[in-house]
Amino acid sequence: MLLKDYLPNINKKFKNLNFSGLAFNSKEVKKNYIFIAIKGDRFDGNNYINDAIKNGAKIIISSKFKDQIKNNIIYLKQKNPRQILSNLSSQIFKKKPQNLIAVTGTNGKTSIANFYYQILKKNKKKVASFGTLGISGKKKIENTSNTTFDPIKIGKNLNYLEKKKINNVILEASSHGLKQHRLDGLKFDIGIFTNLSRDHLDYHKTLKDYLNAKLILFKKLMKKGSVAIFDEDTKYAEILKNICKKNKIKKFTIGELNGDLLIEKYSIIDNKQELTFSFNKKKYNLKTQLIGKIQIKNLLMSILAAHKSNIKLDNILKS
């Protein structure tokens, strides 16, 4: 692979360099790899550059060094190595499933990803989910310690799923993952916002920073003409509506007071929740053993996402 095909804005004298792979973990570096030195919360990749070189790295990308050649190793300065990692990963692993869905919010990401996965499976659609529970698809591919995977793992696994003709993939998008550019380079067909509460403020420091991290999904990572799904009852609905309007994203909302999918009746009978909702001027009834109104809303957002993935609403409710 030629560097100029992946980093067109780099110093001209380095454009014709070849590389064979990419890593940000020095232990995973092989011959002629690019090593991207990333400063994390616990480890600084710049401290492992020598290890990466011993393992075969020929190109080092870091925010700490100027462009130079030293001992036959190319050093390239980039302001945001995390962003470079995501963009390179996305370009190297070009093939991706057709329908990419991301779900973000403080609570409910895992539930929605699981509901969506189950709905599509029951409707005989090929589907996979990435998130807290690992990767689920045709089979369990691998587990992970992060809700949102690193960009190389995302790229490799999306490429794998596309080859297996799995066309629908839902990813949990954490605020950490969004702020750290792990999903940069991807464009989503459907984005889901669950809710926001005071969490992870050890990392984000302020609620505003936490919200802005979540909103990266809708501001920067959605396709034109894509679909945003969120709760009309949340106090952040107006912010999301404005973002959708500005970025030409179609919005579909759920809610008890307002919403495209409107909850009209809700009751608990014999430890089951029963509700009536309307959508597209038609009423539907739903019974579920899920507990709590929050889970009902998570389920309804999953139903909307499945419907926008070309499954008829009647078929979804039968499943």
Question: Where are the model-predicted features located?
Answer:
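P-loop NTPase switch/communication element
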Residues: 131-153, 157
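Acidic, Mg2+-coordinating active-site environments of NTP-dependent enzymes
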Residues: 3, 62, 66-72, 162-167, ...
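Short gly/ser/thr-rich secondary-structure transition/capping motifs
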Residues: 13-22, 83-86, 149-152, 156, ...
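Walker A (P-loop) phosphate-binding motif
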Residues: 89-135, 140
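N-terminal leader/targeting and accessory segments in enzymes
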Residues: 1-87, 91, 235, 262-265, ...
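Conserved beta-strand scaffold positions in the cores of enzyme catalytic domains, especially
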Residues: 75-77, 100, 127-129, 191, ...
